[in-house]
């Protein structure tokens, strides 16, 4: 019961405050006397100070948000000359970007399939390039260390397992280098 009474009294106080604020606002607008004009002058200066204080305050905006907005604007503000230059670059043209009928929507499944196929082709091309470089490296190793390998073959403990182990060691030797280093090693010996 006491909590309900407290709640009611708080409600009354808040309504009284609202009424008082309204009354003071009405009385300020109704009175035009000299004493009220001095008070209104003080209020005007206070309001001007508040406005002055508000103007230099900048809201909390992250720089990344502003950069993203400017990037979005830059993307959409390409002129015709830039578009023509980009159209002449082969990597920026696809059958989807150079289609004539823009009213027909792009089939996203076809785009995804095309991307997957091109990704597989790229992986295959990289794998074949790497295997060619590895083969060239192995040939280089055999040229430089062929006599030692022949000495291994004539040894009494040499068998078929030894050939597999030796071949795997030589293949794994190519993994010591990254692609660029392996290319430079192979090219320097040619």
Swiss-Prot record:
Protein's UniProt keywords contain Nucleus: yes
Basic residues compositional bias, start-end: 9-23
Gene Ontology CC annotations of this record: nucleolus; preribosome, large subunit precursor
InterPro entries associated with the record: Ribosome_Assembly_3 (IPR051898), Rsa3_C (IPR028217)
Record's protein name: Ribosome assembly protein 3
Quaternary structure (record): Associates with nucleolar pre-ribosomal particles.
Ranges where the record places region Disordered: 1-72
Compartments where found: Nucleus, Nucleolus
Species the sequence originates in: Candida glabrata (strain ATCC 2001 / BCRC 20586 / JCM 3761 / NBRC 0622 / NRRL Y-65 / CBS 138)
SS bond partners: none
Pfam families: Rsa3 (PF14615)
């Amino acid at each position: 019961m006491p909590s309900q009474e407290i709640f009611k009294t708080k409600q009354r106080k808040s309504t009284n405050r609202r009424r008082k604020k309204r009354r003071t606002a009405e009385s300020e607008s109704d009175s035009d006397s000299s004493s009220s004009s001095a008070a209104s002058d003080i209020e005007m200066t206070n309001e001007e100070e508040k406005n002055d204080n508000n103007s230099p305050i900048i809201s909390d905006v992250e720089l990344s948000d502003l950069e993203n907005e400017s990037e979005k604007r830059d993307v959409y503000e390409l002129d015709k000359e830039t578009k023509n230059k980009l159209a002449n670059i082969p990597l920026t043209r696809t059958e989807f970007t150079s289609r004539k009928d823009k009213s027909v929507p792009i089939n996203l499944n076809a785009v995804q399939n095309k991307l997957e196929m091109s990704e597989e082709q790229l992986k295959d091309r990289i794998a074949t390039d790497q295997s060619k470089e590895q083969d060239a490296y192995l040939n280089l190793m055999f040229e430089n260390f062929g006599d030692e390998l022949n000495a291994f073959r004539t040894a009494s403990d040499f068998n078929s397992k030894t050939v597999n182990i030796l071949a795997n060691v030589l293949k794994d030797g190519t993994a010591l280098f990254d692609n660029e280093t392996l290319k430079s090693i192979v090219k320097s010996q040619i």
